[in-house]
From Swiss-Prot:
The gene is cni-1. The lineage of its organism: Eukaryota, Metazoa, Ecdysozoa, Nematoda, Chromadorea. It comes from Caenorhabditis elegans. Signal peptide: none annotated. This is Protein cornichon homolog 1. The chain crosses the membrane at residues 5-25, 57-77, 116-136. Widely expressed in the nervous system including in the AVA interneurons. It is found in: Endoplasmic reticulum membrane; Synapse; Cell projection, Dendrite.
């Protein structure tokens, strides 16, 4: 059982996806609080926008690591979300700071429902990814010479 670069990439991805799962759960909670009018949209958007760049950087980092270690299934699974992150950040509203959530439009019914749906999809993706990376890391450790 050897500790290869691919196993190292999967180990880092497990830790990173743990943070992304936290970010996704926090986003779902914040958007649900906006939907039920428990919180101020300016404060919620400020809190959510602080998590955008760390999530995108974390996801981009382990996607690049998978490219370097040439893990095809992981690359193919992560590239659509990486391209989606690039697209949403390029099309973000004009604001003074980084982020994609605009407090003036977040309370529109369509914007709020699409944000909630995207948050749930990201949470499901990160959960499935976590268990796949766990399996792939164990498989890589067991089968490496």
């Amino acid at each position: 059982m050897a500790f290869t670069f691919a196993a190292f990439c999967y180990l880092l991805a497990l830790i990173a996806v743990g943070f992304c799962i936290f970010f996704a759960i926090y986003t779902v909670i914040c958007v649900d609080e906006l939907r039920t009018d428990y919180k101020n949209p300016i404060e919620q958007c400020r809190n959510l926008n602080q998590l955008i760049l760390p999530e995108y950087i974390i996801h981009g980092t382990f996607t690049v690591l998978f490219i370097f270690s040439w893990q095809l299934i992981s690359i193919l699974a992560n590239l659509p979300l990486a391209f989606y992150h690039i697209y949403t950040y390029a099309k973000r509203p004009v604001m003074s700071g980084p982020g994609i959530y605009d407090p003036t439009t977040i309370l529109n019914r369509s914007t709020l429902s699409s944000t909630l749906r995207i948050s749930w999809i990201k949470l499901a993706f990160y959960l499935v990814s976590f268990f796949y990376y766990l399996y792939a890391m164990i498989y890589t450790l067991v089968t490496s010479n």
